[in-house]
């Protein structure tokens, strides 16, 4: 199970989240929907998250709560219904449907 929390502004945060979550799923993590949160502030230098009162910022808190609750929900779901995929069996099925490799 994985989610992503980053600091930064809109475009940079989206790019970071996309790369991190893609990499995590490549390692076998389950990625539920809407499991990223970031702080949106004015672009450029300025106050830090804490100095600007970021912990009271509605958008950040909304996406953070979405992230937390979706991660918890899917963790419970996977605990009750584990994914029992056998990758070796799937590889053999794929071989049967494929042209022989040279």
Where are these predicted regions, by residue range?
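Glycine-rich phosphate/pyrophosphate-binding loop and the adjoining helix
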Residues: 25-102
């Amino acid at each position: 199970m994985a989610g992503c929390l980053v600091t930064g502004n809109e475009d940079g945060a989206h790019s970071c989240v996309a790369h991190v979550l893609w990499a995590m799923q490549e390692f076998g993590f389950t990625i539920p929907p809407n499991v990223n949160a970031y702080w949106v502030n004015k672009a450029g230098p300025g106050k830090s998250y804490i100095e600007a009162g970021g912990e009271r910022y509605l958008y950040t808190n909304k996406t953070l709560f979405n992230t937390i609750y979706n991660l918890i929900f899917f963790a419970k779901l996977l605990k009750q219904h584990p994914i029992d995929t056998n990758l070796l069996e799937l590889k053999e099925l794929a071989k049967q449907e494929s042209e022989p490799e040279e």
